[in-house]
A protein has these predicted regions:
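Intrinsically disordered, low-complexity terminal tails and inter-domain linkers enriched
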Residues: 144-238
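Helical scaffold of the NTase/Pol beta-like nucleotidyltransferase catalytic core
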Residues: 1-118, 237-249
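Solvent-exposed residues in well-ordered beta-strands and their adjoining turns
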Residues: 56-58, 141-143, 256
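Short, solvent-exposed loop/turn segments at secondary-structure junctions
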Residues: 60, 120-121, 258-260
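Active-site nucleotide-donor binding segment shared across nucleotidyl transfer reactions
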Residues: 101-136, 140-151
């Protein structure tokens, strides 16, 4: 699912690069797998023939976001994003009180807070990703779901591609912001480059999208047992907004369901009638209550 870290087999890396044009000449790319650094599952685009992966280069290498697609046999393992505790040492000193407040808030509300973006990649690689303009990017998931492999399992669209891949939901291994910006897709042999589809251009009427999404999410096991989930999460989002207002950096991120569907926390906190829900393949408009009933 989106935001899952995967490691490509080192011996498969040359073939993977060869299938994606001349990207092996970019800084850090050729030795990425040999260094044990992971890639991240990104949103699928129409031209992907395999598991869609992203490789974010640091600012010193142009901050380019390289899109790859790996075959099942090229994947070695998968693991979760880092926790707030994992990234503490790499965080700027000015950020650390905010991280502590976030950790306390998450614990109090039984929310599993994972980190992606610049801070996570700096922790993962040791390369410098953070700048004075960096945000803190977080994923917010219910603790009950994150305690098992189900939270970090790949969504059904990727399941067949990972039939033989080991998954480590609690791995301490420690990401790139999965915003509406697309990952550029390197040119393939005999094909021209194209951009990944973000789904922001979806043209279906809002009501039709919301009804379709409601139907899909209503099939989530036990989704009808917590009709007041929006009310329950409101105090958490309000406290998160207070921490964000006091923080030296912007706190960005999503509430994430176990199937990889996610909604920006600011949209949910704003209390609008519809929110943009990112999925493995695009963006859907849904009612906040519909999303939150599945977020558990």
């Amino acid at each position: 699912m989106r935001h899952t870290l995967v490691r490509v087999r080192a011996q498969a890396w040359p073939a993977l690069l060869a299938a994606h044009g001349g990207i092996g000449t970019l800084p850090f790319v050729r030795d990425w797998a040999a260094r044990g650094w992971p890639l991240i599952v990104r949103r699928r685009s129409p031209c992907d023939a395999g598991v869609p992966l992203g490789l974010p280069l640091p600012p010193s290498a142009g901050k380019r976001r390289v899109a790859l697609a790996a075959a099942r046999e090229q994947i070695d393992s998968a693991c979760a994003l880092p926790t707030l505790a994992d990234v503490g040492r790499q965080a700027p000193p000015a950020w650390r009180p905010t991280l502590a407040r976030l950790r306390a808030l998450a614990d109090a509300h039984r929310v599993d807070c994972r980190v992606f973006g610049s801070l996570a990649w700096q922790t993962l690689t040791g390369l410098r990703y953070l700048s004075d303009e960096s945000d803190l990017d977080v994923l917010l998931m219910p603790c009950g779901a994150s305690s098992s492999a189900s939270l970090f399992r790949f969504s059904s669209s990727f399941a067949s591609s990972f039939a033989s891949v080991s998954v480590s939901p609690s791995s301490p291994s420690v990401s790139i912001p999965q915003s509406s910006r697309a990952w550029p897709v390197p040119a393939l042999a005999g094909a021209s480059s194209s951009a990944a589809v973000t789904g922001a251009e979806a043209s279906a009427p809002m009501t039709a999208q919301m009804e379709a999404s409601a139907s899909r999410l209503s099939r989530w096991p036990g989704s009808s047992s917590m009709p007041s989930r929006r009310d329950a999460i409101a105090p958490f989002l309000a406290a998160l907004a207070e921490i964000d207002a006091d923080a030296p950096m912007r706190i960005d991120g999503e509430l994430l369901c176990a199937d990889g569907a996610g909604v920006n926390w600011r949209e949910l906190h704003a209390g609008g009638r519809a929110v943009a829900m990112k999925t493995a393949t695009g963006v859907e408009l849904v009612a906040p209550r519909t999303f939150l009933e599945a977020w558990r």
